[in-house]
Amino acid sequence: MRLLITRPQPDGARTAAALAAHGHEAVLAPLLRIEPVAAAFGRGPWDGAVMTSANAARALATHPRRAEIVALPAFVVGGRTSEAARETGFDHITSADGDADDLVRLIKRQSATALL
């Protein structure tokens, strides 16, 4: 089967490889490009950083305040985001292993109040 993959990179390539492993032909045609910006986060202090996607974790890799941010505990939605957070430099990562609702419940259980 020939399939059109519209995800941005590098996720599109990963999806294409998984499909190829099952005998499908993937055509990569990303519909958007993820462009990190150096957002101003304010002074803090923060109890942790929340990431709902691997793209969010990847964006922090080039942020001017990266060293300060990766020193925080990270609360992430799932496995891919956890992996990206680790690659960005986070050492203390807690994953909800689910969806955004699971992440909210996890954060409430951790009693974190000031989150980035």
Placement of each model-derived feature along the sequence:
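Signature of uroporphyrinogen-III synthase
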Residues: M1-L116
